Amino acid sequence: MSAFVIYYKDGAKLMRPVKDETEYRLLRDAERNRTADKHHMVQMNYSCLPNENGALKGATRLSRSVGMDIDFDPKAPDYEVKMAQVPELVMGKKEELGLLMLERSANKGFHIVFRRRPGLSQEENLKWASRLLGVEYDKGAKDITRVFFTPPTDR
């Protein structure tokens, strides 16, 4: 899985690879991240490779994985039911999906990361996964440079 942690330098949003699962968990579960509001949480990108200078902005090289949000309206009467169904739904399709990660998002749903299907664009991969899982395609989240605010495991 391609996982890049986002950081800022001189006002520019840069990214560097996460070394391994241990580092990923340390970043995600750090005390600073436990007390942060959503917009100050650790940010990750799973869908692209950084530019030569490490910058995220304008990145065009696809990684081998795709990050996707599965979100629901918390005000909907069936919100809790839908949230409870997602883990079983995703895990039931993990082989076909090429699932690499499933985690709760900071607000109203889940993040998944899956293997990129060769020959499909980012948007086509997201639409394919949405159809496979029977969840709504998020039209606003199709850019490869999309970042994911990553909450600690206890949120």
Q: Which residues are covered by each model-predicted region?
A:
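Catalytic micro-motifs at enzyme active sites that drive phosphoryl/nucleotidyl and oxygen chemistry
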Residues: N53-G58, P87-A106, V135-D138
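A broadly used, surface-exposed interaction patch
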Residues: K38-Y46, N53, P74-E95
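Helical (often loop-to-helix) elements that flank the catalytic cores of nucleotide-handling enzymes
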Residues: D78-K93, F114-Y137
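Short glycine-/aliphatic-rich beta-strand segments at the starts of folded cytosolic domains
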Residues: A55-V81
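Catalytic "initiation/cleavage/transfer" segments centered on a nucleophilic residue
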Residues: P118-G119, L133-R155
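DNA replication initiation on ssDNA origins
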Residues: M1-R64
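Histidine-centered divalent-metal-coordination microenvironment in nucleic-acid enzymes
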Residues: G67-M68, E96-S121, N125, R146-P151
